Amino acid sequence: KTSRILNIEWSPEYAESVRYENASLYHAIRYAVQHPEEVCFSPSAAFHHANPTRGALFCAFSGQVIASMKIYYEFGLCGAYIDLDGHYGNSIDNSRDFVKDIDYAISPVCGNINIMASYEKYLEELRSNLSILRTEITEGRVHYVVFCHGADSHEWDELASQLTTEEWVECSRIVYSFIKEIESQTHRQIPLILALFGGYRRDDYNSVLSLHTADLVTCLNILCGHNIDYLPEVTPRKVL
């Protein structure tokens, strides 16, 4: 079943698009674990509210669970998701009693990091969760990281609001610096995959795109040795 909010009837075309969406994340993870020296990007979203028996909100299938289960069965690897979308991603937790072996595929300790605070408290909780993830990675229990930096955690988004522009970009700095520090500590590269997730600005789509651009630039500067100067352009939301 699809969710009512999607307002889409099942059709061959819709089924095909869902296959591409789910395959995008799976292949990004698969490539990253085989080539950890490269950061992989999946321009995908609409995953983290789906339940095992039905879609929910904008999400038809839990691509996170599908991708990580396939990766586990192929490579025996366990992943963690840093989900900084503006809404709690429930699909992983809702699948734990339904999907066999999911605790081996997505860490039950820190495999589904979501932050439900705002502003400075949000940053504090992110750092605290990453401290737990650091231990899981360095002790060999988590083998890859998927960073889902939804733009709807920005304070001017239509459907959520937690962070200023500066704080939203600071989350990117915190996560990419975290990966860099672990790589320096362990002397090995950590497979890192990026995904889009939420972002709802009917009044100004460019604000969403600018935030995602800022995130990618931060990744390039911290992890890939670039020195790109970019300031996100995010306008206050207009009520339509």
Predicted features and spans:
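Metal-dependent de-N-acetylase/amidase catalytic core
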Residues: 169-240
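Short glycine/proline- and acidic residue-enriched helix-loop micro-motifs
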Residues: 3-15
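Conserved alpha-helical scaffold segments that buttress catalytic/binding sites
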Residues: 30, 39-182, 202, 217-218
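Short, charged beta->alpha transition segments
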Residues: 23-38
